[in-house]
Regions:
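Helix-loop-helix
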Residues: 1-52, 98, 196-197, 217-222, ...
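Aromatic/His-enriched, Gly/Pro-containing loop or helix-boundary segments
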Residues: 10-15, 52-54, 60, 79, ...
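General helical secondary-structure elements
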Residues: 11-12, 63, 178, 246
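Intrinsically disordered/low-complexity terminal segments and short unstructured peptides
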Residues: 23, 50-56, 75-77, 156, ...
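Compositionally biased regions
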Residues: 57-61, 66, 153, 159, ...
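Soluble non-transmembrane domains of integral membrane proteins
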Residues: 86-355
């Protein structure tokens, strides 16, 4: 049976303590006879009066014990503040409010970003969750009683009032058996340095800095559900990580069970949401561990009616990261998932590749297309038109025009298929009497294939433009989902291109209906199938896009409108007129 090891103590500490007590006891026993042998003789008896005075004095004083140490131990040094007070540290990017109760953060405001309601600066500390489960930069220990003492103690601070970065603030606390020191260093970036050390009953214990309970930017149940814990270890056995060296492992809520300890190495780790992150950057990735935290919280069902009694249960995530076997010295990034900022934030790495935080921006499997699209969109915004909505319009126009040759190729392919449609039907009628298992049925496919080759027709040619456009659509979806720049970006009547806009979604549905009506249908298409493509497909796509980001609907609706103009022009060309005449002939034959 393995021996239980207290995680707060180093291995063997209990045995060493027992050995110290045993040696002390032996020294006291051996020292007592020596005191009797070498002590001076007793003084001769004095007069009665003097004896009475001496006896009186002796009665009032404590009688020394032979086993009492010659020098008493020094009194316990305590460091405790008399009252709670706040210390504010700020630079051009943030304003952090510390409380000396727990030496933890009560408010963390990002000055350059608005909250979701767009009525004030962004507050990252979720007050409801923090009051229940702990504030940022409090300390995690495996002993809940010690953890509660660490977060409720009144620390002595090295500074007071409001400080401007660069600055350093130290919090200290000591009582009979607990000694704590927390030091925070601030500069002009989103990164701060965190140093912590905790001793309990004379032994150093593990106490990890933590961000315990979600972000203040989370307001709706959906935003809470978007919370994750991201980490990068660069030494993972995950199959995907082996293929992609900079692959980031992401723990969604359903994969997190509170209190689990994950062993490192960790180059960085911490809770994130769609646009912001609070990740710890250990100074020694090899020695780092992470404790995952998950708790439940009751929030208003409708964030716009916080006074309502209707609530819903959500899950909040957090993480504690650091060294389990001693003091901690690490950095922490708390800020936006903005690619340029993350790439400028250095990280100690194990393999010296991608030594920054760029992995926090999750482009997903379509990153090969999504990231260049995003960088192109940013360039358009900064160099051509200083509005994100119009930048999307310009980019969509260029993409759609670039796909014009494919659309022309699609029309040519459809025309060729219409020309040979009677011959294909004749071949099919020829082999109609044979069953599918009859070997002669294969001859039908061979004849049709030979006909395609002779006429230069490609039955899949009509689908090519759609197949080419599909990756761009998915990449746009991924890009707009993580593009911090589009958060609260305005365009015409739209206040936030990253949020749904139902007017634009309806416009997208109408544009798809128009597109289906003016696009020539392939030869031989069943009328019921044609009707479904004309009506059901736009409605189905509208249902999907109705609650997606307005920026994505803008891209798709504009792409449809440009395609409508292209198709209207192409319908007037010789190729278009020929396709229309053939379609009219097919219609007249069906009427007969």
């Amino acid at each position: 049976m393995p021996e239980y090891q207290n995680p707060h103590q180093e291995p063997g500490s209990e045995r060493r303590l027992l050995l110290v007590f045993l040696l002390t006891f032996l020294v006291l026993i051996a020292f007592e006879p020596l005191l009797k042998k070498f002590s001076p003789p007793s003084p001769p008896p004095e007069k009665h009066a003097a004896t009475e005075q001496t006896a009186s004095t002796s009665a009032s004083a404590p009688v020394p014990s032979a086993r009492q140490p010659a020098v008493p131990p020094p009194p316990t040094v305590t460091k405790q503040a008399s009252s709670e007070r706040e210390i504010v540290v700020e630079n051009s990017l943030y304003r952090i409010t510390f409380s000396n109760r727990g030496a933890q953060v009560k408010s963390w405001i990002l000055k350059k970003f608005d909250n979701d309601a767009q009525n004030g600066p962004l507050e990252l500390v979720n007050s409801a969750a923090a009051q229940k489960y702990g504030y940022p930069l409090s300390l995690w220990t495996y002993d809940e009683a010690v953890r509660n003492r660490l977060s409720s103690a009144l620390y002595v601070t090295s500074s007071e009032g409001t400080l401007s970065a660069p600055a350093t603030v130290t919090f200290e606390y000591a009582d009979q058996d607990l000694s704590v020191r927390k030091t925070f260093h601030f500069d002009h970036s989103y990164v701060l340095r965190v140093e912590t050390s905790v001793a309990y009953k004379g032994s150093e214990i593990s106490a990890l800095p933590m961000w315990p309970s979600g972000f203040g930017d989370q307001a709706t149940p959906a935003s809470f559900a978007a919370g994750r814990i991201d980490y990068h270890d660069n030494d993972s056995t995950d199959k995907t990580a082996l293929v992609f060296p900079n692959y980031v492992l992401r723990l969604a809520i359903k994969k997190v069970s509170g209190g689990d300890t994950l062993k490192g190495p960790f180059e960085w780790a911490g809770p994130v949401d769609q646009y912001f992150a609070a990740v710890f950057i250990p100074g020694d990735p090899e020695a780092a561990s992470m404790v995952t935290l998950r708790n439940s919280l009751e929030v208003p069902r409708d964030p716009e009616k916080p006074e309502s009694k209707e609530t819903t249960k959500v899950e909040v995530l957090g993480a504690a990261v650091g060294n389990l076997h001693g003091p901690n010295d690490e950095r922490m990034y708390v800020g936006p998932k903005e690619l340029s900022v993350l790439e400028a934030t250095p990280v100690p790495t194990i393999k010296n590749d991608h030594p920054d935080l760029r992995g926090l921006v999750d482009f997903g499997w379509w990153g090969l297309i999504a990231k260049p699209l995003f960088l192109w969109l940013r360039w358009t915004y900064f160099h051509i038109v200083p509005n994100w909505g119009w930048a999307i319009v310009v980019q969509t126009l260029i993409i759609t025009l670039a796909l014009l040759p494919l659309r022309i190729s699609q029309m040519k392919s459809m025309l060729k298929m219409q020309r040979i449609a009677p011959q294909i039907k004749s071949i099919q009628e020829k082999y109609k009497k044979y069953s599918l298992r009859d070997p002669r049925k294969a001859a039908m496919n061979e004849e049709i294939t030979a006909l395609y080759k002779k006429e230069g027709a490609n039955p899949a040619g009509g689908c090519l433009p759609m197949l080419i456009q599909f990756p761009f659509l998915i990449a746009y979806y991924r890009m707009l989902g993580i593009a911090l720049d589009l958060r609260h970006a305005h365009w015409l009547w739209i206040r936030d291109l990253s949020a749904p806009d139902h007017i634009l979604a309806i416009g997208m549905i109408v544009s798809m209906l128009l597109m289906q009506r003016i696009t020539p249908q392939p030869a031989g298409m069943d009328p019921a199938q044609q009707k479904m493509m004309t009506w059901m497909m736009p409605l189905f796509m509208g249902f999907i896009f109705f609650n997606l980001a307005a920026g994505l609907n803008l891209y798709y609706a504009e792409s449809n409108l440009i395609s409508i103009v292209q198709q209207a022009i192409m319908n007037r060309t010789k190729l278009g007129r020929e396709m229309r005449e053939m379609a009219e002939k097919r219609a007249r034959k069906k009427d007969k």
